[in-house]
């Protein structure tokens, strides 16, 4: 058992494992630890508990709280090792496939639907061939779709299951990681000054906590690499335009390299018969999309994201993405919507022009405006070229009536230097999930929690259980 750090107060509360963050990664880490018989687990979450999030709805935090960003996500479980993160850097293909299958079985046990989208291999292969002929790559994957309402139900079941086995504290933001002797994790310090000791600490701060993790990594001299920052727009079209694709794949992951800049543009979070929604990132407003399991609109929406990896000396991709989002908020109040035809003609959209378009916006509070005043030229040129290419696969995407919402930004700022079990350079300190740059989706985030928990469980076996609270 690790010795208590010298600066921890006498009588400090102690646990075997502290998990920072109650998103999919943190929840699955806690679940796997309990399955392995590890006791003395404390799960800390900066945001509100699930019941409070559901009461507040979208008026509360979209990213912080029980369930993390997953609580208000579209609820797509991508059952592919090629989609949703970078876990292939830490696992062999066989290990990752086993983790994905294990995570899928766990989601099914807690209420995920049996229906699988994208399981018609012949139809998917046909779409792949069509995309390849048009210089695009379609990444095949099977999906389970929870729907936004299904996410809340499933997270509630996980919360109830863990409640008797894990100490759960929401509204408890962590300020710092405490180190002990030999550069090992010794606990955490909360923002209110409370110190809590632990033998193991798992960091699962999610997208909401990625900036905090970057600060802590700098303070602890942990080596990091910069992840790409994804910036783009959300596209909304009649559902019939994308139906031949979504009927086969539900969500099409399509990658295209532009001729002009050779930048990668990709489709992301395709929402058949869904709606565009506004995300509040602590007063910074961006866009996203949802589909419900039982409520359908006449439209399909998806993001087009341009991925850029910055080189030295620039190391502030989060600040860069935030700057672009703030610019959109400054010009439009919150989120801007523009008809593609208006954008190509170099004019702003007005309420009148939006109203006479053939696509009725599902995000009614979006402000008609001019996205060319927001996105840097290179990003905008890449997206317009991608729309032209995609129109050859799904005619109608490049219509003058297509709606564009901006901006959509995915903040994945850094990757910590991690071992194969996701342990950092600090002994017994693990980093998992989206906030650590390990994953970009529900399944791989959950898998990262399982991987770290299994490593800790192996170390705990045979040790004196000590005086760990339950």
Language model: regions and residue ranges:
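Residues forming the flavin
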Residues: 2-84, 122-470
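Dinucleotide-binding Rossmann-like beta1-alpha1 core, especially the glycine-rich loop
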Residues: 65-117
């Amino acid at each position: 058992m690790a010795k208590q750090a010298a600066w921890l107060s006498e009588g400090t509360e102690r646990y075997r494992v502290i998990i920072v963050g109650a998103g999919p990664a943190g929840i699955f880490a806690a679940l796997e630890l309990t399955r392995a018989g590890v006791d003395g687990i404390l799960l800390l979450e900066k945001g509100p508990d699930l019941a409070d999030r559901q009461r507040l709805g979208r008026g509360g935090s979209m990213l912080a709280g029980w369930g993390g960003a997953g609580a208000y996500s579209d609820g797509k479980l991508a059952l592919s090792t090629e989609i949703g993160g970078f876990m292939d850097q830490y696992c062999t293909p066989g290990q990752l496939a086993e983790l994905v299958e294990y995570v899928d079985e766990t989601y099914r046990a807690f209420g995920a639907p049996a229906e699988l989208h994208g399981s018609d291999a012949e139809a998917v292969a046909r779409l792949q061939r069509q995309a390849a002929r048009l210089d695009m790559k379609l990444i095949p994957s099977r999906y389970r779709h929870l729907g936004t309402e299904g996410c809340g139900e499933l997270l509630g079941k996980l919360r109830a299951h863990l409640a008797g086995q894990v100490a759960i504290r929401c509204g408890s933001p962590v300020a710092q990681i405490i180190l002990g002797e030999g550069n090992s994790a010794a606990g955490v310090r909360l923002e209110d000054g409370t110190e809590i000791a632990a033998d193991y600490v798992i960091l699962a701060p999610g997208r909401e906590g990625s900036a905090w993790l970057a600060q802590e990594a700098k303070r602890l001299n942990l080596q990091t690499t910069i992840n790409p920052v994804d910036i783009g727009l959300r596209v909304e079209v009649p559902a019939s335009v994308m139906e031949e694709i979504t009927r086969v794949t539900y969500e099409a992951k399509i990658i295209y390299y532009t001729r002009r800049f050779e930048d990668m543009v990709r489709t992301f979070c395709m929402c058949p018969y869904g709606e565009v929604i506004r995300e509040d990132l602590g007063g910074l407003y961006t866009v996203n999309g949802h589909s419900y399991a039982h409520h359908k609109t006449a439209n399909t929406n998806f993001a087009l994201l341009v991925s850029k990896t910055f080189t030295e000396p620039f190391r502030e991709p989060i600040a860069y993405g935030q700057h672009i989002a703030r610019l959109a908020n400054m010009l439009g109040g919150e989120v801007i919507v523009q008809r593609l035809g208006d954008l190509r003609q170099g004019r702003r959209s007005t309420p009148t022009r939006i109203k006479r378009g053939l696509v009725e916006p599902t995000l009614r509070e979006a402000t008609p405006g001019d996205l060319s005043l927001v996105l840097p030229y290179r990003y905008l040129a890449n997206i317009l070229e991608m729309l032209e290419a995609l129109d050859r696969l799904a005619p109608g995407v490049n219509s003058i009536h297509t709606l564009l919402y901006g901006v959509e930004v995915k903040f994945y700022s850094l990757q910590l230097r991690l071992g194969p079990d996701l342990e950092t350079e600090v002994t017994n300190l693990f980093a998992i999930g989206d906030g650590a740059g390990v994953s970009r989706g529900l399944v791989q985030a959950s898998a990262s929690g399982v991987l770290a928990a299994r490593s800790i469980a192996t170390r705990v076996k045979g040790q004196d259980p000590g005086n760990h609270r339950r």
